[in-house]
Amino acid sequence: MEIYGMVTGKAGKSGYGSASTAEDVTHSIDAKHLTAIITGGTSGIGLEAARVLGMRGAHVIIAARNTKAANDSKEMILQMYPNARIDCLQLDLSSIKSVRSFIHQFLALNVPLNILINNAGVMFCPFQLSEDGIESQFATNHIGHFLLTNLLLDKMKSSARESGIEGRIVNLSSIAHTYTYTEGIMFDYINDPDRYSEKKAYGQSKLANLLHSNALSRKLQEEGVNITINSVHPGLITTNLFRHSGLGMAVLKAMSFFLWKNIPQGAATTCYVALHPDLKGVTGKYFTDCNVTTPSNFAIDTTLADKLWDFSIKLVDSLP
């Protein structure tokens, strides 16, 4: 049924489907009272999400490694919507030091935080270690976002408490989370080049995004905090993430042309989960084409989620 919906664009229970765009799913939503951080908001899905949230009135903070690209994105959005509120801050998610620096920069703005969209990522990279000695896909896609989210939680909690507005965290996962290592997360061999598979390492990092969402969702519910966190699969979209994918991906794309989305369609699920009023109180879910769907067995394994949480905490605490 999911494949049928992807091919035909038929709407699901939410009223939206694979053919829906980010503008479609946010139609008539007024976001002027909201502040959102979007990581990687300089191209592809992230840029489209920044544009649409800015169009709907949200104060958007583009967090990006390349400050020139971020400012170019800001100028593009302002040319389209002169009254949009867009700020840019430097953030390299592969660097723990950069994440901590970003937090100081953001808190200095003295603004609330209602929405965090963990969008940035790398894909199918040849093996390399980050400056902190962590395999690059795991470092950028999971550890950087894990630390960023944890360090922003107090601000999100106070914003939700003072405004009465539900905070929302959106983790960009992927259907690729189903293609990972045999054990799901290869805890003992994350940084082992001999066991490295660029595609399985990507799948592992996307599984980690889902496990992070589910673990944090449970913790926030236990605290009674007015913040939700959900994961999304944006669909198959040609973005610069595919720069390391090579001939095999080109062949796959040619064979499955009817499944691929354009960027406005690819950003729809992100914007739907971030803004739509129908999702008030919905947390710990996995969305595809703006509808709740079922992830892999690994993704709903609470023991694995807790193990990853503890592993991630110990890892970031061990770094300056």
From Swiss-Prot:
<dbReference type="GO" id="GO:0015031">
    <property type="term" value="P:protein transport"/>
</dbReference>
<keyword id="KW-0472">Membrane</keyword>
<comment type="subunit">
    <text>Part of the Tic complex.</text>
</comment>
<comment type="function">
    <text>Involved in protein precursor import into chloroplasts.</text>
</comment>
<protein>
    <recommendedName>
        <fullName>Short-chain dehydrogenase TIC 32 B, chloroplastic</fullName>
        <ecNumber>1.1.1.-</ecNumber>
    </recommendedName>
</protein>
<keyword id="KW-0934">Plastid</keyword>
<feature type="binding site">
    <location>
        <position position="140"/>
    </location>
    <ligand>
        <name>NADP(+)</name>
    </ligand>
</feature>
<feature type="binding site">
    <location>
        <begin position="92"/>
        <end position="93"/>
    </location>
    <ligand>
        <name>NADP(+)</name>
    </ligand>
</feature>
<comment type="similarity">
    <text>Belongs to the short-chain dehydrogenases/reductases (SDR) family.</text>
</comment>
<feature type="binding site">
    <location>
        <position position="119"/>
    </location>
    <ligand>
        <name>NADP(+)</name>
    </ligand>
</feature>
<dbReference type="GO" id="GO:0016491">
    <property type="term" value="F:oxidoreductase activity"/>
</dbReference>
<keyword id="KW-0813">Transport</keyword>
<keyword id="KW-0150">Chloroplast</keyword>
<dbReference type="InterPro" id="IPR036291">
    <property type="entry name" value="NAD(P)-bd_dom_sf"/>
</dbReference>
<dbReference type="GO" id="GO:0009706">
    <property type="term" value="C:chloroplast inner membrane"/>
</dbReference>
<feature type="binding site">
    <location>
        <begin position="40"/>
        <end position="46"/>
    </location>
    <ligand>
        <name>NADP(+)</name>
    </ligand>
</feature>
<keyword id="KW-0521">NADP</keyword>
<feature type="active site" description="Proton acceptor">
    <location>
        <position position="196"/>
    </location>
</feature>
<dbReference type="InterPro" id="IPR055280">
    <property type="entry name" value="TIC32"/>
</dbReference>
<feature type="region of interest" description="Interaction with calmodulin">
    <location>
        <begin position="301"/>
        <end position="317"/>
    </location>
</feature>
<feature type="binding site">
    <location>
        <position position="174"/>
    </location>
    <ligand>
        <name>substrate</name>
    </ligand>
</feature>
<keyword id="KW-0653">Protein transport</keyword>
<keyword id="KW-0112">Calmodulin-binding</keyword>
<dbReference type="InterPro" id="IPR002347">
    <property type="entry name" value="SDR_fam"/>
</dbReference>
<dbReference type="Pfam" id="PF00106">
    <property type="entry name" value="adh_short"/>
</dbReference>
<dbReference type="GO" id="GO:0005516">
    <property type="term" value="F:calmodulin binding"/>
</dbReference>
<keyword id="KW-1001">Plastid inner membrane</keyword>
<keyword id="KW-0560">Oxidoreductase</keyword>
